[in-house]
């Protein structure tokens, strides 16, 4: 039987409670054999202010994996460097697991930008998109895509970076291990 693999990519700068909720809900819904967190090197459709080295983001993701009790990190995009195109990452995963059933987790913001994605039509033939809706903002999706709804959690990595810089509390926004890591490493302070 083919393996089922979930791919959950992002900058994770830093990884926070909303990311953890998405991962938990998708993992419970799909019940994959493997759940990969994939930190991007440079996301083609995002701004790159407050960029943080991959090693710090990887350490924080690993602490969240330890907290969640599931998941692995795929370092392909960080090791490849340059623009992080999902198509290239999917080809890498399929090279390692040619018979796998792949699920790619994206939010409604990314769903609405799919027309801008690199090799999107080819990509659709290799994966099943899992569109994560937040609370009442349910996105109608194409028939070959899956859709799940999670509670709305208004947390962003930008907000966390800003609060750290302003020496404000982030305790309810990230896991205790991520907060401790941010403080110990002095991340986002300047």
From Swiss-Prot:
One GO biological process term: NAD biosynthetic process
Pathway in which the depicted protein is active: Cofactor biosynthesis; NAD(+) biosynthesis; deamido-NAD(+) from nicotinate D-ribonucleotide: step 1/1
Reactions catalysed: nicotinate beta-D-ribonucleotide + ATP + H(+) = deamido-NAD(+) + diphosphate
UniProt keyword annotation of Kinase present: no
Origin: domain of life: Bacteria
Designated name of the protein: Probable nicotinate-nucleotide adenylyltransferase
GO molecular function: ATP binding; nicotinate-nucleotide adenylyltransferase activity
Record EC number: 2.7.7.18
Keyword Amino-acid biosynthesis: no
Protein task: Catalyzes the reversible adenylation of nicotinate mononucleotide (NaMN) to nicotinic acid adenine dinucleotide (NaAD).
Coiled-coil annotated spans: none
Pfam families: CTP_transf_like
Keywords: ATP-binding, NAD, Nucleotide-binding, Nucleotidyltransferase, Pyridine nucleotide biosynthesis, Transferase
EC top class named in words: transferase
Homology family: Belongs to the NadD family.
InterPro entries on file: Cyt_trans-like, NadD/NMNAT, Rossmann-like_a/b/a_fold
